[in-house]
Regions:
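Short, basic, low-complexity termini and linkers enriched in Ser/Thr/Gly/Pro
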Residues: 2-14
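Bacterial N-terminal signal peptides
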Residues: 16-28
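Sec/Tat signal peptide C-region and signal peptidase I cleavage site
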Residues: 28-34
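A short beta-strand-turn-helix
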Residues: 37-58, 81
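Short pre-active-site segment immediately N-terminal to redox-active cysteine/selenocysteine motifs
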Residues: 56-58, 62-66, 98, 141
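Conserved redox-active cysteine motifs that mediate thiol-disulfide chemistry
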Residues: 62-79
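Structural microenvironment flanking redox-active thiols in thiol-disulfide oxidoreductases
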Residues: 74-113, 125-132
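Thiol/disulfide oxidoreductase modules built on the thioredoxin-like
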Residues: 112-114, 122-170
């Protein structure tokens, strides 16, 4: 087969080789980009991140790679984002893993391929200030989720695994309220 406008002939084998080169060189780069951590958050960064979401219903979820319930609910959280994202819902994940295990966090995100941004809680700083920015009742248990309405008002706190059916019902209710 001749390439258009060229005297060069490309065989079926040549086309297959070109396709494989594209898949193995560009494909992995493109597929890895969305699954990087969006950054690190301290209390001020968390407040700013939430403030930027005004007008959207937000579920803020704290997790860690060593937390089995966190790992189990993660795929369901991604489904929630996929299902309600276009309607004005935004899920934001925050890993509480220490900086030294960042490669494990990156690996987990690459495996899970989440449809929502994920941050890591910044190490050091004032942990009490961070807890106050999240919810003063939070004792550090994981998973831990906080649901906000479109105005940024805290509506519900979920300590432990997210009760998916109840949370989804609450999300639908908040999305319907204008």
């Amino acid at each position: 087969m001749k390439a258009p406008g060229s005297r060069l002939q490309v065989s079926a084998t040549g086309r297959a080789i070109i396709a494989l080169l594209f898949v193995f060189s560009v494909g992995p780069i493109l597929s890895a980009l969305p699954f990087e951590l969006a950054g690190e958050l301290d209390a001020a960064g968390l407040r700013q991140t939430l403030a930027r979401q005004k007008g959207r219903v937000v579920l803020l979820n704290f997790w860690a790679t060593w937390c089995v319930p966190c790992r189990e609910e993660f795929p369901e959280l991604s489904k929630l984002q996929g299902k309600y994202g276009a309607a004005g819902f935004q899920l934001i994940g925050v890993s509480t893993d220490f900086a030294k295990v960042r490669p494990a966090v990156q690996k987990f995100l690459a495996e899970q391929r989440p449809s929502f941004p994920n941050y890591r809680k910044k190490s050091g700083g004032d942990d009490q200030d961070f807890i106050e920015a999240v919810d003063s009742s939070w004792g550090g248990e994981l998973p831990f989720s906080v649901l906000y309405d479109r105005s940024g008002k805290k509506v519900r706190v979920y300590s432990g695994s997210l009760p998916l059916a109840a949370a989804e019902k609450e999300i639908r209710k908040l999305l319907a309220a204008r």
